[in-house]
Amino acid sequence: MSFSHQEIEKKWQAFWEENKTFKTDEQAEGPHFYALDMFPYPSGAGLHVGHPEGYTATDILARMKRMQGYNVLHPMGWDAFGLPAEQYALDTGKHPATFTKQNIDTFKRQIKELGFSYDWDREISTTDPHYYKWTQWIFLKLYEKGLAYIDEVAVNWCPALGTVLANEEIVDGVSERGGHPVERRPMKQWVLRITAYAERLLEDLEELEWPESLKDMQRNWIGKSEGAEVTFKINEHSVNVFTTRPDTLFGATYMVLAPEHKLVTEITTDEQKEAVEAYQKQVALKSDIERTDLAKEKTGAFTGAYAINPVNGEKIPVWIADYVLISYGTGAVMAVPAHDERDFEFANAFGLPIKEVVAGGDVSKAAYTGDGEHVNSDFLNGLNKQEAVEKMIVWLEENGAGQRKVTYRLRDWLFSRQRYWGEPIPIIHWEDGSMSALDESELPLVLPDLEEIKPSGTGESPLANAKDWLEVVDPKTGMRGRRETNTMPQWAGSCWYYLRYIDPTNDEALADPEKLKNWLPVDTYIGGAEHAVLHLLYARFWHKFLYDIGVVPTKEPFQKVFNQGMILGENNEKMSKSKGNVVNPDEIIASHGADTLRLYEMFMGPLDASVAWSTNGLDGSRRFLERVWRLIVNEETGKLNSNVKDVEGNEAFVRTYHQTVKKVTEDFAELRFNTGISQLMVFVNEGNKQEVLPKALIEGFVKLLSPVAPHIAEELWEKLGHTDTITYEAWPTYDESLLVENEVEVVVQMNGKVKTKLVINKGASKEEMEAAALADEKVQAAIGEKTIRKVIAVPGKLVNIVVG
């Protein structure tokens, strides 16, 4: 071993901690740069090698920006509420707070051992009452503005977990955690009106430097559709249907309601009641994903009722079917089987009529979904789709049968969880049926310490068991009330944590407005693609709301977002405990060192690619650092090599250095770390060929290496004679004029055969090339007594002398 990574890494980590090297100086001059990591959920398993990939990327940026004169904010914290900690507590009998603290301590130790340049004075945890005071404050503001409300919602109820799950917590009809069955059940829930921001969330994506694929995921989730809302009468009732194809209204031959639609019980005839109720029970056991699976067999039940098609007065049967969701649109669809695939399959399954209204296909065999001339459509006949859509909307509006409408796939955000380990919702329900919000002065509403945190199983959270905390009396009126027993979802704390880092100890406000102005928006935010939709969408929604009420100065929270790829096991499979292919960073730090792990994870491929872990690759990264060490340090004495001197160096090596500064600077700024590191390797290879190493160039190289491998860089910096940390040294700059070669090697031929090679000025003219070739001793000897017939010079390449 050429250097002891254990000694060097411990030494410099202790130095950084004692000196608070990475503390952000609010008073510092210069531009600001905010480098943010998606903060981790501190699980019991500790850090795995996937975590440091994103953290190393932001750390390289933060370290480089400090050296470029930026005032850098680079914080870390913990997303510590949520289901897994509570589930663990239920399984083991330990309190989630105890378990969470242990996990945070482990994560923090592991992160510090990797040498990340975080300002630990800004550390936050979503479970800290000083933090969640402001999460609750944001909720109160949303409630004040009518954006937080209670609604009866068909929710995913998991009896085994005793809680409601969001759609994204369900995989293939069972809970993601534990694989328990999930059923649909109506419940009173807190909901946030994110739909009020749908258009802005969509439009403002254009201003962001995000990967296009990520923007598309958000666009699809928001799911804007333009069309018309059409009113159908069913007896004395009416039902609104949204359609993007109002032009096909003449082809509507039946209607389908979601089985949960409130009209179903009112319109179902006595003859159909039994079949309808049986079908409703069957559907309650299915998830939305199962219900909308295109490949599955169509099922449904006839209600016995008929709706009137407003455009032609025809009676059409009303069915219920699971492929229509109450949570999407109005929970009712007009079925046009000739021109919609699902409607076509349903019509065939139940023998319902199929009426062609757009020519161009054979609707006896399949639905025709393309454009074409309208037929069997009265005043729309002969028109194409766009003209017919417009004309039908005008007709609907003139006849009071409908209107132009824009809808979004985005649903309001189900915000309550029947769990203990989350932020309490600061609301009181009074015995007279009213409810009121806590006053801001009463925040934080602290989570009570419970012995027993088993779900109540009634739909209420374990907080229903905390009698002293739960029951309140209004001191003015004597009226009794109960606190809200639901808690907030894990998303709540992670929606705004990047704001609290800016001013983490402020008791008077969420953060100081001046500080927010200095640091927002976040310059670069790096994290896993699994948060591409929900976390980023929820955070953008809260940020826009806070902008509207004057708390934050920007419309968007994150200017640039980058999703790192996944680190797979050596067999190209996802790392998991069950497969036994998880790599623990503690072991790598012990065997190879933190610098090696950092270097390897940045060198293994493009940052956004998923790449398999390779022990050989890890060994290669260690060998490179050993080569760096040997280039600069004498292994026997441990001092600087004697060939590192205050000299200028030869032109070729100076050129390699300037090329290295340029490439590393540009590649690191664009997160192309693997190609930047390749160039560092080129420099070391060239350095090993030099008899003398110019000290200034070696110092510049060590600075370039320092963001990737900070411990070894600090040690080398010290050996180069410096007494202070490398952290705030000036980042190297390059000279454009020294990037290119000024001289070029040209071949001299005689009658097409190579006689010699000459090094001449790159810009030499043909005449100068000829003169240099003819003056060369070897050439003169070869010409001898022969006559020169012709000299051909190709600038920068060759001189051919024709003799006879």
From Swiss-Prot:
Reactions catalysed, as given in the entry: tRNA(Leu) + L-leucine + ATP = L-leucyl-tRNA(Leu) + AMP + diphosphate
Gene Ontology BP, a term: leucyl-tRNA aminoacylation
Short sequence motif named 'HIGH' region, residue ranges: 40-51
Cellular component, GO, one term: cytosol
One Pfam family recorded for the sequence: tRNA-synt_1_2
Signal sequence region: none
Keyword Secreted: no
Chain location of the short sequence motif 'KMSKS' region per the record: 574-578
Keywords assigned by UniProt, alphabetized: Aminoacyl-tRNA synthetase, ATP-binding, Cytoplasm, Ligase, Nucleotide-binding, Protein biosynthesis
GO molecular function: aminoacyl-tRNA deacylase activity; ATP binding; leucine-tRNA ligase activity
Keyword Transport appears in the UniProt entry: no
Source taxon at top rank: Bacteria
Residue positions binding ATP: 577
Cited Gene3D superfamilies: 3.10.20.590, HUPs, Isoleucyl-tRNA Synthetase, Domain 1, Valyl/Leucyl/Isoleucyl-tRNA synthetase, editing domain
Its EC number(s): 6.1.1.4
Subcellular location(s) of the protein: Cytoplasm
Main location: cytoplasm
HAMAP family named in the record: Leu_tRNA_synth_B (MF_00049_B)
Matching PANTHER family: LEUCINE--TRNA LIGASE, MITOCHONDRIAL, LEUCYL-TRNA SYNTHETASE
Family the entry assigns: Belongs to the class-I aminoacyl-tRNA synthetase family.
The protein's name in its UniProt record: Leucine--tRNA ligase
Organism from which the protein derives: Shouchella clausii (strain KSM-K16) (Alkalihalobacillus clausii)
